[in-house]
Amino acid sequence: MAATKVVLDNQDGPVILVGHSWGGAVITEAGNHPKVVALVYVAAFQPDNGETVLHWLQTFPPAPENGVLPPDAKGIVYYDKAKYHAGFCADISKEESDFMYASQGTFYAKGFTTPITRAAWRDKPAYGVVATEDKSIAPEIERSMYKRSNTKITEIKGSHVIYISQPKAVAKVIIEAAVNASKSK
């Protein structure tokens, strides 16, 4: 959150925050910044006040392809390499998948268990992309979160990395958020 706030503080104008996966929880909190005018959730979690990502993960059984492993002794979460392509990014090439696996950043489990204190989508326009072939976050979870928050929903056929496999369709949603934000000024 602190790094996101620094970036937002340094912007000259209005900001559209885009979050993917657990990054949806980040934009849900960071979106309270006064420069943020809209939120775009791309195959992302959208918790409410007091909720966690883990809460939502537990609302629907995981796909058999899902390869998220339990945290290690340091609290770091990894994805099972054998399930990575099918469970995370089945609609991109195996070469791209192998590169993504090798270059993934560190993710601490506390990101799944930290509750939201103030959900920005309660006060700001929100847009949600449901990745209909997502094996990491069940599309049913994405739809449930987005519907209860009155988020404008766009469904796109693709895996959890919909922003890579369907970049034009995802960009169209982000552009729509920006255009609508500029109209409401």
Per-segment meaning from a language model:
Residues N32-V36, V40-K81, G111-F112, I137:
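Flexible "cap/lid" loop of the alpha/beta hydrolase fold
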Residues F99-A120:
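Active-site nucleophile elbow and catalytic-triad environment of alpha/beta-hydrolase enzymes
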Residues M1-I16, A30-H33, L54-Q58:
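Active-site loop/oxyanion-hole signature of alpha/beta-hydrolase fold enzymes
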Residues T132-K157, I164, E176-A177:
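Conserved loop-alpha-helix segment in the C-terminal half of the alpha/beta-hydrolase fold
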Residues V18-G23, I27:
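Gly/Ala-rich beta-loop-alpha elbow adjacent to hydrolase catalytic centers
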Residues N10-G13, A177-S182:
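Glycine-rich phosphate-binding loop signature in dinucleotide/nucleotide-binding domains
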Residues L39, P125-D134:
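Conserved strand-to-loop "acid loop" that flanks and positions the catalytic carboxylate
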Residues W121-A126, R148-T151:
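Short, proline-enriched alpha-helix->beta-strand connector loops that line the catalytic pocket
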